[in-house]
Swiss-Prot record:
Membrane-spanning parts: none
Listed name of the protein: tRNA/tmRNA (uracil-C(5))-methyltransferase
Organism: Pseudomonas paraeruginosa (strain DSM 24068 / PA7) (Pseudomonas aeruginosa (strain PA7))
Entry GO CC: cytosol
Entry-linked Gene3D superfamilies: 2.40.50.1070, Vaccinia Virus protein VP39
Presence of the UniProt keyword Transferase in the record: yes
Length: 363
């Protein structure tokens, strides 16, 4: 993780540049002007990861970050204004704690995971085996800080408390509860994520047919979108994300979602009846009347076959973390679908990265 150039005074201009960039990429497809959802200027990032750096000639260690491609010139961090207030409050207290050998010896990396709801988990990574002495010290520290702790060393993982944090997000007047596991992907900007969920909920609209969701992760979008349709079939390949999504569905009493651990390629084969899958043994695909598909793919976007799969739906709701691959995918779909809505979500202030969304509807 490299440190963004934090400059609140430049935020508005940087956001305008992103808006212009997205509009330019989507201009060939006659897209409407993007709806823009701003980020808080500071304390917006709910996750942070730091290496530890020892000063030459003494035992002092600091939180450190590095510019991309340079692992030898540390940027020493005393506070981190883009991170949540909870992370900033925990950083000096943890730094005091690692003076104890049981916690600090050969500690080389620290990862913070927090939520808008105030929960926190800290992962401590070591170049040595962790043992009962570590666990005893970690239990005392977790109680003192009011957090869960996870210790990691080669081949070993010890959890003190829980290995996930609990989040609450408000979408269309309803609070959804999420378990967000340590080590799994979660949206880093909680406030913007909440806005993104609200936009997707509104863009999909109230439907009497069914929704297919690809790349569902921990169910971030699944929970609110499930309230807009008759049934959802959601797919995900990460086992930890599938387990988190199942727990989140149960915690929120959402009972119209079937979740299967299949890749997009495998699902395409199943829908085309190329071959059967044991993981679909309890699911009758012919019972679904799919009208919409929701996709939130990785930075590489959808592969051509998955793009062709989405073409068969009346509505394609697409959230993207890479506007270039979004534009490439839209180019493949443009002959059958038009962009009726698009949005820019500023998940990553002070960087060139952006999250965007489009609703494509059949011509």
């Amino acid at each position: 993780m490299s440190r963004p150039q934090f400059d609140p005074a430049a935020y508005a201009a940087q956001l305008e540049d992103k808006k212009a960039r997205l509009a330019g990429l989507l201009a060939p497809f006659a897209a409407p002007a993007p709806e823009v959802f701003e980020s808080p200027r500071e304390h917006y990032r709910l996750r942070a990861e730091f290496r530890l750096w020892r000063e030459t000639g003494n035992e002092n260690r600091h939180y450190a970050m590095f510019e991309q491609g340079d692992k030898h010139t540390p940027i020493l961090i005393e506070d981190f204004p883009i991170a949540s207030r909870r992370i900033n409050e925990l950083m000096p207290r943890l730094k005091d704690a690692w003076a104890e050998p049981a916690l600090g010896f050969k500690l080389f990396q620290v990862e913070f995971l927090t939520t808008l709801a105030g929960d926190a988990l800290i992962t401590l990574c070591y170049h040595r085996p962790i043992d009962a002495a570590w666990q005893q010290a970690a239990e005392a520290l977790a109680a003192e800080l009011g957090v869960s702790l996870v210790g990691r060393s080669r081949g070993k993982r010890i959890v003190v408390g829980r290995d996930y944090v609990e989040e609450e997000l408000l979408v269309a007047g309803r609070r959804f509860r999420y378990r967000q596991p340590e080590g799994a992907f979660t949206q880093p900007n909680g406030e913007v994520n909440q806005k993104m969920l609200g936009w997707a909920y509104e863009a999909l609209g109230e439907r009497e047919d069914d929704l297919l969701e690809l790349y569902c992760g921990n169910g971030n979008f699944t929970l609110p979108l499930a309230t807009r349709v008759r049934k959802v079939l959601a797919t995900e390949i990460s086992k930890s994300s599938v387990n988190a999504a199942l727990a989140n569905l149960a915690d929120n009493a959402v009972d119209n979602v079937s979740l299967v651990r299949l890749s997009a390629e495998e699902l395409t084969q199943a829908l085309n009846e190329v071959r059967p899958f044991r993981r679909l043994a309890d699911i009758d695909l012919k019972s679904y009347a799919f009208g919409s598909v929701f996709v939130d793919p990785p930075r590489a976007g959808m592969d051509p076959d998955t793009c062709e799969l989405t073409r068969r739906f009346e509505r394609i709701l697409y959230i993207s973390c890479n506007p270039e691959t979004l534009a490439q995918n839209i180019a493949q779909l443009h002959d059958t679908h038009r962009i009726s809505r698009c949005a820019l979500f500023d998940q990553f202030p002070y960087t060139h990265h952006m999250e965007s969304g489009v609703l494509l509807e059949r011509r």
